[in-house]
Amino acid sequence: MDKTTNGVAAYYSRFGSWAGYNMVLGRSQHAGYWTSETKNEQQAQANFLRMFAKELQLKPTDRVLDAGSGQGVMARHLVQANGSEVIGITITPREVKISEKLSRHMTPAPRFVLGDYSHTDFPDEYFDVVYVNETLSHAKDMQATMQEFYRILKPGGRVVFADYEVDARHMSARQQRMMDFLEQHAGGFGVRQQNPGEISQALQQAGFADISETDWTEAVMPTYHRLRSLARPFAWIQPDAKLAPFFVNAVMASHGYSTLYEAGLFRYLLYKGTKPLAHRAK
């Protein structure tokens, strides 16, 4: 494993990370989707699963890649909802084991593999859909990642991402230290490649067409604000403090996306793109 793979796997294998996701987000590793009728995080997470599944528009015959599958929450939901063939890929060995354990009662069940979704062993034109839920910040080379998604998609295949953009180009020195912290301690090697417009630009340069962005910011921010509130006792720990590496998620919640949103430097978007039908693998 290289530095990038080790850094991401180490973050998600850390007790404070996976235990926090389990207790606070119900094993999900993404924000919830809040409406005027949503009362709690559990409902928001269920909303997110439904909303994202609706946007995917899967057919039972589709072969689907969950790129950065975490503990397999979305993969299991999609198999149950659509009957599609879903393969989850993660570079964290622990997540493969947990995902397989949580899916063993299912028929059919999603399949999980260990690997880096930026450099896979899948054949050309293998998948109908590739989706991502908040893991592009771990992609060290965003352009290479989009090229890989393009390679493994069939002509007419689609990408759907629920992820954020951060305007790192206009951050203060203090905010830049938070970006440094994400890279050093949370595997955020791609976060500075998520400036406004950069993900869509990477999709376009990879060859995708019909690229769209839908703003989900206001629907997901209650989760980020909630995480910030829960981390308030740790707000005094700055990202460059010696104690910070021992409280990674708390520091991220205190000084990360909620505060960047208030500064106008954070948006959460649903990205879509299609591989043209005319393409044929070289």
Question: Which role fits each region the language model picked out?
Answer:
Residues 143-158:
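A short glycine-rich, Lys/Arg-flanked "PGG" loop and its adjoining helix->strand segment in the class I
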Residues 118-129:
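A short acidic, Gly/Pro-enriched loop at the edge of an enzyme's catalytic core
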Residues 248-282:
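C-terminal lobe and adjacent flexible extensions of AdoMet/dcAdoMet transferase-like proteins
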Residues 165-190:
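Short, glycine-/aromatic-enriched active-site segment of Class I SAM-dependent methyltransferases
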Residues 65, 74-119:
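Class I SAM-dependent methyltransferase SAM/SAH-binding core
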Residues 217-262:
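C-terminal helical/coil "lid" or tail adjacent to the Rossmann-like core of SAM-dependent
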Residues 191-207:
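Short alpha-helix
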Residues 1-21:
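N-terminal auxiliary segments of SAM/dcSAM-dependent transferases
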